[in-house]
Regions:
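Glycine-aromatic micro-motifs
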Residues: 1-116
């Protein structure tokens, strides 16, 4: 499954156990822990990530599911204008894969905390 359209990186409320995890609960697929590079912050009380290939690594989850393309318009609406969907690399079990992620456009902090 090397198609980024069938992979989604989640790091906040959509992650397993998160308050909005129910939006992905109906999909069949495989969850794996992963690492992503960038800056982590918050916006309106929710985690917000900005991709930076030179930034520190942060823990996240990767969902691989053939059903993702079908629900992405719904997720785009849910995330709204505060987030944009990008394709970035994620490190999963020692190898890099390309996957989609919702990156925050805004932050409540002046500078994203590199260690968050």
């Amino acid at each position: 499954m090397d198609n980024p359209e069938t992979k989604l990186i989640v790091y906040g409320s959509l992650a397993p156990g998160g308050v909005n995890a129910f939006l992905l609960a109906g999909l069949s697929g495989e969850w794996r822990p992963c690492r992503i590079r960038g800056r982590m912050g918050a916006y309106l009380g929710f985690k917000s990530f900005r991709y930076d290939p030179q930034g520190p690594e942060h823990p996240a989850w990767l969902l691989a599911s053939a059903g993702l393309p079908r629900i992405m318009p719904e997720l785009d609406d849910f995330e709204g204008e505060a987030y944009e969907r990008l394709v970035i690399p994620a490190r999963v079990e020692g190898r890099w894969v390309m996957a989609q992620v919702y990156a925050g456009k805004y932050s409540d902090e002046r500078v994203f905390d590199p260690g968050a």
